[in-house]
């Protein structure tokens, strides 16, 4: 029996979904012969993905991949006589006899429909059919599990929440001196609330003594708005847009930050929170969605819609060394409960029900 794993949607640059999939593979390979439908990944048998359907091809690539998933993927499934298809994204063949387990990261497109309006048919018609036909659904947080039931009516007994983890060999305390910059890591979509973060930073009484580093790929839809806001507030010299930072450079940037500020309006998980805690960096994050699940009592939780609260939290960390020390210590302890070994073991337990 071969476990067929659909990774046809992976991007060459690491994202949350890519990180999740690549960290699960070693745990699955230990127990099952595996074949990956993906770009070449060293150490694994891979069925190549046609070049015209990769995520780098944009909307056309996504469309080609969905068509390929419906017609070509079932043929691979039958040829291998697989008992189950596992996909770390809610994409699977619908009109076939494929049995599949999928992972769902979040319901953000349904919570912020205006942002994702071009993809409305995908999220309103295709995704719910995949979820309904799946043998089982894995979610990365209790928040996402509840959202799936809320938006799609999927019964709770068909869903298992298995949290993400972080790379312990990569993200850890480096004992570097703290520099005077606040850090954000993530994309620039409006639900990430970067505009609120910029406004909160500008309201710091002594903002000129600090910098705000925004790490994440630039986006022609949103970057101009953010840079215009920075200019209007007169803080151009204090705000740095660092675009995409190589994975190997992230630990140093996180370790040296005075704090990670992650004020999202909604998240399926919020991996940067764990990575910052592992580095001993204090965390300010939202009191909404999955973020309290991830942060526990080891972070300052703020109302992301309240700019004043964000400013006050940043000011408190900037001026109170005892608070920084306490949050650093609590974060290092708290993040130890998350590991890819636990995530992998729990995932194997779900898959084993259908193999």
Model-derived features with residue positions:
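Carbohydrate transferase catalytic cores enriched for Leloir-type hexosyltransferases
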Residues: 1-355
């Amino acid at each position: 029996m071969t476990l067929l794993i659909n990774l046809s949607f992976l991007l060459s640059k690491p994202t949350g979904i890519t990180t999740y999939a690549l960290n699960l593979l070693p745990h699955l390979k230990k127990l099952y012969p595996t074949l990956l439908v993906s770009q070449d990944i060293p150490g694994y048998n891979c069925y190549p993905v046609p070049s015209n359907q990769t995520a780098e091809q944009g909307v056309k690539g996504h469309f080609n991949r969905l068509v390929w998933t419906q017609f070509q993927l079932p043929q691979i499934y039958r040829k291998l006589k697989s008992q189950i298809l596992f996909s770390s994204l809610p994409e699977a063949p619908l009109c076939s006899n494929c049995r599949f387990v999928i992972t769902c990261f979040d319901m953000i497109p349904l919570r912020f429909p205006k942002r994702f309006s071009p993809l409305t048919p995908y999220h309103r018609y295709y995704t719910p059919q995949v979820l309904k036909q799946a043998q089982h659904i894995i979610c990365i947080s209790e928040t996402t599990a509840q959202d799936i039931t809320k938006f799609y009516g999927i019964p709770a007994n068909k869903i298992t929440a298995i949290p993400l983890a972080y790379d312990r060999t990569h993200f850890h305390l480096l004992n570097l001196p703290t520099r005077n910059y606040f850090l954000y890591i993530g994309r620039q979509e409006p639900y990430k609330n970067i505009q609120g973060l910029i406004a909160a930073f500008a309201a710091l009484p002594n903002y000129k003594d600090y910098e705000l580093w925004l790490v994440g790929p630039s986006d022609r839809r949103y970057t101009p708005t953010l840079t215009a806001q920075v200019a209007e507030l007169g803080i151009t010299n204090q705000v740095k847009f660092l675009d995409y930072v190589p994975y190997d450079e992230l630990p140093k940037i996180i370790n040296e930050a005075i704090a990670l500020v992650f004020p999202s309006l909604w998240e399926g998980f919020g991996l940067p929170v764990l990575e910052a805690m592992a580095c001993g960096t204090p965390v300010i994050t939202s009191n909404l969605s999955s973020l309290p699940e991830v942060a526990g009592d080891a972070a300052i939780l703020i109302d992301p819609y309240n700019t004043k609260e964000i400013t006050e939290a940043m000011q408190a960390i900037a001026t109170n060394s005892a608070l920084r020390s306490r949050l650093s210590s609590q974060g290092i302890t708290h993040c130890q409960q998350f590991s890819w070994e636990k995530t992998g073991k729990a995932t194997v337990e779900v898959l084993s029900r259908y193999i």
